[in-house]
Amino acid sequence: MALPIILDCDPGHDDAIAIVLALASPELDVKAITSSAGNQTPDKTLRNVLRMLTLLKRSDIPVAGGAVKPLMRELIIADNVHGESGLDGPALPEPSFAPQNCTAVELMAKTLRESPQPVTLVATGPQTNVALLLNSHPELHAKIARIVIMGGAMGLGNWTPAAEFNIYVDPEAAEIVFQSGIPVLMAGLDVTHKAQIHTADIERFRAIGNPISTIVAELLDFFLEYHKDEKWGFTGAPLHDPCTIAWLLKAELFTTVERWVGVETQGKYTQGMTVVDYYFLTGNKPNATVMVDVDREGFVDLLAERLKFYG
């Protein structure tokens, strides 16, 4: 039986590729997709979800837009990474269908309520919508199998020296998620920075030769340009968000540890930092499964294999 998931995302090049991967995978049953503000403004990320589903001919999937700003802060966006549209690069279709006439939290709650089995939440942007769901619907916590997030880092940040972008945008929301008591899987920069897509990989995807693999290659062409900045020391572009979907499909590609994670909401230099108690110094019981390594070649092979689904 396929694993039911709700995808909460802020497309974003890597979010878009996570959508492509999820919908190419019969092991997953994507019940709904909700949009969060982060990589771009809320109107643009919602439009990008609709554009991707139009491209993939999946207007059957319910879509709803989420919170327009973080719980307690003003919105920060990453337009320097993802461009003016949030998905700069390829020519994508205009949306052929409209979102549901409800909020992301309402769509998530309805989906959980109606599902006969617990649902996995996959959140690849800021955690605002998930935190709002958890706070407003405590009665539905038991319907959530786990929360798989792309965010955080045990080590270095990518938006500040200490913080990864998604967590930095809404640290209060992330703290609610980590302390919810629901199993959390954290795909942080420690792993996603190893899940780099190189130029040769992009050409491999392009050579698959179907319309979707071509668009994925064009998304990656654009995404790679930003990551060529020497400060990162990258040889490719880190494909952050698809690590969440890849873990659901093939967990053996990843090395994980069980640890306690807290989110810094106050620090002068460290707001948005995920504090991972790697050496069990706090005495707190682990509340998260934390990714620490990935088989990069296996990850790329999985993407290439699933892109053939669209042939």
UniProtKB/Swiss-Prot annotation:
This protein's encoding gene: rihA
A GO MF term: purine nucleosidase activity
Record EC number: 3.2.-.-
Protein name as catalogued: Pyrimidine-specific ribonucleoside hydrolase RihA
InterPro entries: I/U_nuclsd_hydro_CS, Inosine/uridine_hydrolase_dom, IUNH, Pyrim_hydro_RihA, Ribo_hydro-like
GO biological-process terms attached to the record: nucleobase-containing small molecule interconversion; purine nucleoside catabolic process; pyrimidine nucleobase metabolic process
Keyword NAD tagged: no
GTP-binding is among the record's keywords: no
Annotated keywords: Glycosidase, Hydrolase
Organism whose genome encodes this protein: Salmonella arizonae (strain ATCC BAA-731 / CDC346-86 / RSK2980)
Superkingdom per UniProt: Bacteria
Pfam families reported for this sequence: IU_nuc_hydro
GO terms under cellular component: cytosol
SUPFAM superfamilies attached to this UniProt entry: Nucleoside hydrolase
Active-site residues, Swiss-Prot/TrEMBL: H240
Top EC category: hydrolase
Function per UniProt: Hydrolyzes cytidine or uridine to ribose and cytosine or uracil, respectively.
Family: Belongs to the IUNH family. RihA subfamily.
